Every structure is written in C-alpha cells, then in structure tokens.
Amino acid sequence: MRTLWRFIAGFFKWTWRVLNFVREMVLNLFFIFLVLVGVGIWMQIGNGSNSEQTARGALLLDISGVIVDKPSTNHRLGALGRQLFGASSDRLQENSLFDIVNAIRQAKDDRNITGIVLDLKNFTGADQPSMRYIGKALREFRDSGKPVFAVGENYSQGQYYLASFANKIWLSPQGQVDLHGFATNGLYYKTLLDKLKVSTHVFRVGTYKSAVEPFIRDDMSPAAREADSRWIGELWQNYLHTVSANRQISPQQLFPGAQAIIDGLTSVGGDTAKYALDHKLVDALASSADVEKALTKQFGWSKTENNYRAISYYDYSLKTPADTGGTIAVIFANGAIMDGEETPGNVGGDTTASQIRDARLDPKVKAIVLRVNSPGGSVNASEVIRAELAAARAAGKPVVVSMGGMAASGGYWISTPANYIVASPSTLTGSIGIFGVINTVENSLSSIGVHSDGVSTSPLADISMTKALSPEVQQMMQLSIEYGYKRFITLVADARKRTPEQIDKIAQGHVWTGEDAKANGLVDSLGDFDDAVAKAAELAKLKQWHLDYYQDEPTVLDMVMDSMTGSVRAMLPEAIQAMLPAPLVSAANTVKAEGDKLAAFNDPQNRYAFCLTCANVR
C-alpha cells in the first residue's frame, strides 16, 4: 500500500512539474511575444514618422479592403498585426475615408509627390458618397497639375468608379471592366419558418416598411419592389453620370444595356479588353511590364524597391494639423444602431450619446458634426442619441449632420435635432417607419411532444417564446409600435417645420435618395463632409477651426487580440471557401450578412427603425 501511495504521490509531483514547466514556458513566450510586438510597433511608428518621400515620386493608392467612415482598427496598427499574425484576408481590412482624402490632399501640396497611381486590385468596396468624396480629392490633385494614373488587370464597378477620376486608365490585354448595374438581394424565410412551425408575429407601421417581409413572405411585395426599383435606379443613374462625365463619353456609351454589350462583345470575339478600349472605357491596353516601364519614365526608378519610385498610402505619413481656431467635434454614427455600448462595426446608443455629452460639456468645442452612415436599428438607442444631440443644440452648440451612404430610419431619427442636414445625392435616407417581430415556437415544440404550461397573475405576465402570444400582448405591442411611429413623425415634422400629415405622406417607410430627400424637405442641402464642416463653422461664427474626431484609439492589447482573432477569421473562411463552388461561397456570404443584421436586434422594447434593403445593394 505504501508503494502505491508513493507511486500516486510521485505521479502528481511529476504532473505538477510538467504543468509548472508549461506554465512558465507559456508566460516566457508571451513576454517575448509582447517585447516583439512592442519593438515592431516602435519600428512601424519610427518608419511612419520618416515615411515622407525623400525623393520625387508617386503616391501609390494601393487600397486594400473596404472604405468606411470609422474603421475599427487604426490602419498602421492593423497592417502591423497582419504582418505579425499572418491574417491574409483583404476583406477584413477597413480603411478610413478621411485618412485617404487627407493623404491625397497632403500629397497635392507635397513637392516630393509628383503624381498618384491607383492600384485598386485589392479594393473591395465603398458606398457611392464615399467614392464621390475621394473622387473630389483626386480631381483637386489633378487640378494642381499633377497626374493621376489607374492600373489594373480588371476593374470591378467600385474600382472603375475611382479609376474614372484618373488622367489615364491602363487595362491588362486579358482584362475586363465589369459594368453590370446594381441589384438588391435579400433572403426570405417564410417557408422555412412554416416548415419549422415557427409562429411569426409582425407589428409595423408604414406601407413601404419592408424590413419584416423576410419573415412573412418568400418574395418581395409589389410595394417594396416598386420602391426599391425607383431608388436603386437613381443610384445607377448617378453612377453612370459621374463616370461618363469623367471619361468624357455619354452614359449610353458607358453602359448601352445588356443586349448591346453582348452584341458588342460578339463583334470582337468575346475580347472584353478590346471592347473596353473600343468604347473608351480605358485609355490603353498594356501588360504589367509595359505599365511599369511607363510609370518608371514618369516617376523614375527606385533601386532599393526595384520598382518605379513610389510610396504606398500605408507608408505615407499624415501630418497632424495645427490646433488653430475653435474646435469642431466630429462624432461618428457608423453601422447599425444597437442598444448599449458600441461594438465593432455598429453604433452603441450609450457610447455615442456619451461622446455627444462630452462635446457638449467641453467649452473648447464650438460646434458638432455628426457623421451618419447607418441603416438605423434600435428605437430606444436612437432616442438616446437624439436626446443627447438635442441637449447639445439647446446648450447653444450648432449641430450639423453629414450623411454618408445611408442615414435611413433610425439613422434619420438621430439626425432630427440638427440645425442643418447635408446629404450626398446618392445618400439613402428617409425610411421613416417602425416595426417589431416576435417569433414563438410553441407549435415547433408541440410537434416533437414538448409542451409549455404554467400560471400567471395576468395575461401580460405570460410572455415566452415557447407559448403563443396572448391577444393582450399583441394589442399592447401594436399600440407601442403605432406610438413610436407617431413619435417619429412628430420629431421629423417639428425639425423640418412641417405638419405631421405632410411628413406622413413622404414617410410610410419610403426610402429616398439624397436628391429626392432634398426635394421633399428632409435635408437642407446636397454636398459632402467638407460642406457640413463649413456650415458648422458658419453657424458657430468661426473664421478658423480644427476638427477633433471623437473615436477611441485601440490600445496595443486591443490590436493584438483583434489581429489574433482576425487571423483565425481570415483563414477559416478561406479554407472552407476553397472547398465550395463559387455560387455556394456567395450564398454563404449572404447568409453571414443576414446573420450579422439579426445580431444587431437588441432593443429592450423590440421596436426597430431599420432599413434592411439599404444595406443590400450589390
């Protein structure tokens, strides 16, 4: 027995030594890892601070990923994280719209930057107002006498929109300019819910409030189809007008229609590159070697980089503007509006309201610009933000709303207290309506022999997804939705100096482009972020000003954790997608996007001012 106990004691002693060794090894490795991260960040910052062109050359706009108003990670820290952890998915990278525009404007006045090269092969998307704003900066750069060149093996619609602002567009002899138009695509679940015996209870106000249709239909309603066809057609016409004007051709020549394109391709034997050249979509067909030769002639040769002389946007150091004059606070509402604190890619009602409060209480802040790029979301969170913005205005601080790609439904709700609203012609706004959806599974459970029962002190207390909603609960829910809609209408009417009846005619969940919103009196003027800032300065009577962007900079630990998890997110989908046919990959991405939308539904009263179709444009 003593031998047995000695054996057991020895086993546990040996096990403890192994575990202790592993513990110490992990801690030491983690310490070394943190040292390497610190050194890497120091080197990155050091390189960034000396990254201005010391020799004359181009600014290479090699944008990778998507362009958003407010990235979740600083692009320099994000780049370092990808190098350290090997995240390879460009789709995960977010780029700041304002950093890009500021880089172009700084390059315009930088004597060492003699041109811009747009290399957009890894650029995966942005809303039209954002690209229009970048295009404005590119046009300013060109007007200064410096050229802009676009190079690409192929151009997607978004890539080509930006490329059209260049002096010259090169296309690979085997390439294509992929113009096909816009579409909205959503998933509809009625048959699935019926098969699962899920009971869907819908509460809504607004003829065109189609956000609930996926739960109660298998296709679009005629009203939703008519409404979406109108605004998506306007977006496409805006696209054609801008790009054709840049290329100095007619919209008809740019996109003559599906059959005409097929006929044109047939005439050149299916050669998409020749078709693009013949129709003046591009200026020249050239291999990568020929493009390199031309750019070397333009900008010179770098022996150290073994390429034409250029500095990447990601290495180009942005100067911090001097804090002169009064402060204009810039606060972002970027993404779906959720109750509570902010999460990456979403607007937290409490977080945004806190930022507005800080700006209101800061005596140095003379005006507020709220940059809205949101399809809406929680009514409760929207009201929290709106109330704080109204308090800022009541405190004597001018509030100007700058609308980005979307300021719809809840995004418009939070805009109502503004002194002035500026929208882009392609902004999607309006969608003034409210809905709620409650799903119960009593029939699903019953079909497999599971039943729910109990007692309650009133019908209002007996609420569970395992039981059918009582008539009393349904009646209260509908009354709450109707009150919310009346509240929405009243807020808009008071803000726009109209009657509730006048607003109701243009509400009902109707989505409007910025141009239509201006005609309907929902916004004050058409313009961009610069116009909104200028208006804020005018209202605050500032002759000089500087911008203070209210956004939390990620810590080193945030960057480490984000990059580590980002690597996993980047690699797993690619590994899975490699085994799937292309149509299934597209379907999987659509399902993921739908899931992300549903995850944003956390309103405590289950009331939403949300425009689902606004975020579905492809």
UniProtKB/Swiss-Prot annotation:
Keyword line: Cell inner membrane, Cell membrane, Hydrolase, Membrane, Protease, Serine protease, Transmembrane, Transmembrane helix
Membrane topology designation: Single-pass membrane protein
GO CC annotations, alphabetized: plasma membrane
Protein's UniProt keywords contain Protease: yes
Disulfide topology: none
Keyword Nucleotide-binding assigned: no
Biological process terms in GO annotation: signal peptide processing
Source organism superkingdom: Bacteria
Enzyme class: hydrolase
Pfam families documented for this protein: Peptidase_S49
EC number: 3.4.21.-
Residue positions of the active site: K209, S409
Segments on the Periplasmic side according to the record's topology features: 46-618
Family recorded in the similarity comment: Belongs to the peptidase S49 family.
Protein function: Digests cleaved signal peptides in vitro, its in vivo function is unknown. This activity is necessary to maintain proper secretion of mature proteins across the membrane.
Subunit composition and interactions: Homotetramer.
Protein name, UniProt field: Protease 4
Organism of this sequence: Salmonella typhi
Gene: sppA
